[in-house]
């Protein structure tokens, strides 16, 4: 990736990661790019702990519509969320679990407010499996232990960013799409970020930062 295109968001990996962490601390979303040889996509990511209905609506409006809740393996076990399929043969081994809906406080589960309620239910400290119905309209993703140092995915990046910002290890993500329904690539992601005032970083930035600081 031509790093100069990311210079408006920081001239180094460290700057971009610190800007993203600061944005997370203030409850603002960030855009995370993966490698051009991987998915070559940009995800808009919010801390699960602070996401609002307005932010969820933006994910739904500008994203693919598949809004995912990225959580740790420990949280998946706490909620008794099994994998979506027994044998995961997807190219990038994206670890979807069964989909979920809050058992209380939602109507159809589709609206932005309902999805936020489901997310807040799932990440509550005292959450138990019966707090959730299955299936639903929120797609949990199980993050690999070790985060981006183990798997260079948006799932792990969101959990790592939440942890580095001092939040629960949970993030809400959705891939950004163009108006014609195609996937937004780096140039479109940069323009989207400038339009809405988001920070941008790459997963490799996060890897470099974690290795440099041994965190």
UniProtKB/Swiss-Prot annotation:
Keywords: Lyase, Magnesium, Manganese, Metal-binding, Riboflavin biosynthesis. One of its GO terms (biological process) is riboflavin biosynthetic process. The keyword Manganese applies. D-ribulose 5-phosphate binds at residues 38-39, 43, 151-155, 175. Binds 2 divalent metal cations per subunit. Magnesium or manganese. One of its GO terms (molecular function) is manganese ion binding. It catalyses: D-ribulose 5-phosphate = (2S)-2-hydroxy-3-oxobutyl phosphate + formate + H(+). Mg(2+) 2 binds at residues 39, 154. Pathway: Cofactor biosynthesis; riboflavin biosynthesis; 2-hydroxy-3-oxobutyl phosphate from D-ribulose 5-phosphate: step 1/1. Mg(2+) 1 binds at residue 39. Its cofactor is Mg(2+); Mn(2+). The record marks 137, 175 as: Essential for catalytic activity. One of its GO terms (cellular component) is cytosol. The keyword Metal-binding applies. Belongs to the DHBP synthase family. PANTHER family: 3,4-DIHYDROXY-2-BUTANONE 4-PHOSPHATE SYNTHASE, GTP CYCLOHYDROLASE II-RELATED. Catalyzes the conversion of D-ribulose 5-phosphate to formate and 3,4-dihydroxy-2-butanone 4-phosphate. This is 3,4-dihydroxy-2-butanone 4-phosphate synthase.
